Amino acid sequence: PQGGSVHEVCDDPDFAEECDFQVVDTAGVLVGGVNDWCRAANLILVPMLPSTRDMEPTLRTLDIVRESGTGAKAYVIVNNFYAYGTLDRQLVEYLEGEGVPIIAKIPRAVALSRAAAAGVSVAEYDPKSHVVAPIELLADSVLNEEEKNNG
């Protein structure tokens, strides 16, 4: 399911300010306010699928982030990554060659959609799934970036 369909929206700005993390899940088509969101962010994660269709929108999003004047670092998360897929590897190599930092490559896993449908994390749904370790590594990377920002 789409990310925005499985999480709750916080409409209370005072409560949001007390939270350790705030997630802004934008639509697939960028809308107004993106520059403000970028400037307010500590860290920006841009998800993409390893496909030629996602390359142009991902690069366009990264350009918008750069042009926003934010001080936040921006990283790409490659979802549905297949390590043995030629196109998957070539796209990652291209991005890295262009200096685009990739914070995580999350592998394909049926457990992701099943966990979302069940309303639980993939670690709760299937703790032995091969996707749990990369997601934990992503979470650790986000926490490390937050420590750098606050440390």
Segments from the language model and where they lie:
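P-loop/Walker-type NTP enzyme "switch/lid" segment
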Residues: 1-35, 116-124
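Structural beta-sheet core signal
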Residues: 24, 46, 76-78
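Inter-motif core of Ras-like GTPase G domains
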Residues: 31-52
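Short histidine/acidic/glycine/proline-rich micro-motifs that form metal-
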Residues: 50-52, 79-84, 128
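Conserved C-terminal guanine-recognition region of P-loop GTPase G domains, centered on the G4
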Residues: 56-79
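Beta-strand-loop-alpha "switch" segments that mediate conformational coupling across diverse proteins
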Residues: 82, 92-121, 135
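Alpha-helical, hydrophobic structural elements that either
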Residues: 86-90
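NTP-binding/hydrolysis catalytic cores, primarily Walker-type P-loop NTPases
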Residues: 119-151
